[in-house]
């Protein structure tokens, strides 16, 4: 709930402040007597503080879930048999459904949908040029939560598995860095709201 409310706040309120900032950086808001840019800076400071609270609450919740036999894992903490299962699952279920894109100078940047999760990778060509690779992680045909075999309540997120195997999607490139991102668009100009 916190995260979806935060996305909505950024789409609407921060988006509006960004519009104001682009139009005129000197206008001050009546109640606070600060500019749009100063408001955005204050919002970012407060969001960083709130995100730390959210992260602590998440860690606490995940520990409690472990007490009930439910554990969300990353690939590094998977057992050997789980890693084999995840590799097969990726190669047979996920890989055929991926839609990878490579961003280059002569190609337009792909449209990234609002609030969707993307795996992004910095790739290096054989001639040492950098490219950006992007894979959408949302897929209506696949569950976001992957249940590991054995019925022990162990799960992995789809986007984490895609990020782990992203190098096998972009064969012929060296992976220099990778991350998951989510785009939150300004509600005033969002084409896919």
Residue ranges of model-derived segments:
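N-terminal non-catalytic structural scaffold regions of very large proteins
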Residues: 1-193
């Amino acid at each position: 709930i916190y995260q979806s409310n935060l996305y909505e706040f950024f789409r609407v309120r921060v988006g509006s402040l960004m519009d104001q900032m682009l139009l005129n950086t000197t206008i001050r808001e009546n109640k606070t007597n600060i500019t749009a840019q100063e408001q955005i800076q204050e919002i970012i400071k407060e969001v960083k503080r709130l995100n730390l609270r959210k992260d602590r609450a998440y860690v606490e919740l995940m520990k409690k879930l472990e007490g009930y036999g439910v554990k969300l894992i990353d690939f590094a903490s998977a057992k050997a048999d789980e890693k084999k299962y995840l590799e097969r699952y990726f190669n047979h279920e996920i890989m055929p459904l991926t839609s990878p894109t490579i961003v280059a100078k002569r190609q337009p940047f792909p449209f990234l949908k609002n609030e969707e999760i993307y795996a992004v990778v910095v790739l290096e060509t054989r001639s040492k040029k950098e490219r950006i690779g992007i894979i959408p992680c949302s897929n209506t045909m696949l569950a976001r939560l992957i249940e590991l075999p054995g019925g022990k309540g162990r799960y992995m997120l789809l986007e984490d598995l895609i990020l782990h195997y992203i190098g096998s999607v972009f064969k012929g490139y060296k992976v220099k860095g990778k991350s998951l991102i989510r785009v939150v668009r300004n509600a005033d100009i969002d084409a896919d709201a």
